[in-house]
Amino acid sequence: MGQGSSKHADSKLDSYPSFSRSDTQGSIKSLKSLKTVLGKGKDSNHDRRTSTDTTHSRHRYPETPPSLPPPPSPGILATSPAVLQKHQQEDSGNSSQSPTSPHPSNQPAMLSPSTAASQHHHHHSSSSSYAVSPTSPTSPTSSGPIGSNFDSASEHNGPVYPQDQQGPVIIPNSAISSTDPDDPETVVSLNVDEMIQRLIHVGYSRKSSKSVCLKNAEITSICMAVREIFLSQPTLLELTPPVKIVGDVHGQYSDLIRLFEMCGFPPSSNYLFLGDYVDRGKQSLETILLLFLYKIRYPENFFLLRGNHECANITRVYGFYDECKRRCNIKIWKTFINTFNCLPIASVVAGKIFCVHGGLSPSLSHMDDIREIPRPTDVPDYGLLNDLLWSDPADTENDWEDNERGVSFVFNKNVIRQFLAKHDFDLICRAHMVVEDGYEFFNDRTLCTVFSAPNYCGEFDNWGAVMSVNSELLCSFELIKPLDQAAIRRELKKSKRSGMAIYQSPPAEQVTQSV
C-alpha cells in the first residue's frame, strides 16, 4: 500500500464509530466487573484442573516432519458432496453406533442435564467440564441431510485439496489462483504439513522471535489458497456433530497450542472457531496462519467464522496492522484483509445450534438472509453483517436498544425466544464477550457465550473454554486455566504431547453423522 492508500484508510477509519471502550465485551458491564470479582479469587481456582494435566508419552521433536494423518471422512460440512453421497447410499433406517474416543483421558465427563444444572453454579469443583442439554434429544426430522437443498454448496469452485492423502500435502503454485492485482509477493507452492510443523515448533519454543517462521511469499500463498476454500463453501455453514466450538483467541498463540493440547490437534477433533483470531495478543500472525493452514489441510473438518476483528478498520486500531507492519509489511496486512473479507459468517450445527460471533440482528428474518450476504465484503457500519458480528445479549426492557460499544444493538430475552421458535433452534452459541469462567449462559440456557482466550490481555484472570457438541447433541465444556507467559512456557516445555505425537494423532473415531 502506498502513502496515498494509507491516508485513504485513515480517513475511512475516522468515519467509523468510536471504539474508545473495550470492544470485546463487556464494554463496562463485564470487563470492569471481572476485575473486581477476579482480583480476589486467584487462589480459589487452583483446585480446578484442566485436561492439559493429563500425561502422554514424550517424544522428541522430529527434524523431518512426517505427514499429518488424513481427516475423518466424510467431513462435517453437511452440504459437502461426500456427505450427500454417503447419505444417498445409506438406508435411512440404519442407526449409527456409539463411537469410542481415541483419547479417553481428554474427553470431558458427560453429566446428565439435571446433574449439570445443579453443578453449573459450582465452578470450583475438580471437573473441567459441565455438561448441559440445551438441544433436543432427537435429531430434527428432515427427509435428507441438512443443507441438501443448498445447491450451490456442491459446486466446488476452488481447487480440490487431497484430504485423504497419506503423504505430505503439496499444493503447487499453479493451483493457487491470484485474483488480487496488488499481490504483495509471487505465489509459491505450499508444503502444508511442513509449514504446520514450523508453526507448532514456534508454539513450543521458549524464545519469541521478531521474524515470522514463514516467508512473505508463503504467507501470501496461504491466504490465496484458503480464500478459495472459503468462497467455495457457504456463507452459512451447516455442520454435523461431533464438533468443538471455540470462541475468541485474539493472537494468544501459546494458549491456542494449549487448547489443541487439551482438545486434540486436528484431525483428532472437528473444530468450529467463532472469530476474533487477531489483535490484542502478541502473536496474531502465528495464530491466524496456523488456523488457515489447518483449514487448507482439513477443509471439511475445520471451520472458521468471521469475527468483528477480522476487519480492516478494527485491525488498524487494535494491533494486527502494527504487527504486520513490524514483522512483515503493510501489503501482507492488505492480503490478510482481502482473505478476512471472504470468511463465512455463521453456522448451524445439527439444525439446532445457531453459531455466530456476535449475535442477532433486527434485519435477520430468514437464514437465506445470511446465505445471500455477498463475499468478498468489508464489514459495513450498520446492517445485517455488522449486527451478526457486533451485537450482544442484555437484560433490557426493549427488544432492541443501542449498544454501549457504540456499534450495533443489544437484544433481550424476548428476541432470543422469538428467534429460536421461528427457526426451530434450541441454542444460540456466540463469542465476542470475555466471561469469567470461559463460558456463560443467558436466558435459561438458550444462549451461551464462549470465550477461549484465558488470562485475556494479561489483565483478567478469566478461564478459557471450548464447547464440545457430541453426536447426541449433548454439550459440555473443557476449560483452559489462566496462566501468565512464564507459566505457559513451563507448561509447554513439560508437555507430553509435543513433537511426533502431534502428527501421529489419529483421526476422530467419532464418524460424523448427518442429522
UniProtKB/Swiss-Prot annotation:
Its EC number is 3.1.3.16. It is found in: Cytoplasm. Residues 63-74 have a biased composition (Pro residues). It catalyses: O-phospho-L-seryl-[protein] + H2O = L-seryl-[protein] + phosphate; O-phospho-L-threonyl-[protein] + H2O = L-threonyl-[protein] + phosphate. Residues 40-51 have a biased composition (Basic and acidic residues). Binds 2 manganese ions per subunit. GO terms for cellular component: cytoplasm; endoplasmic reticulum; fungal-type vacuole; nucleus. Residues 126-143 have a biased composition (Low complexity). Pfam families: Metallophos, STPPase_N. Keywords: Cytoplasm, Hydrolase, Manganese, Metal-binding, Phosphoprotein, Protein phosphatase. Mn(2+) 1 binds at residues 248, 250, 276. The keyword Phosphoprotein applies. This is Serine/threonine-protein phosphatase PP-Z. It comes from Schizosaccharomyces pombe (strain 972 / ATCC 24843) (Fission yeast).
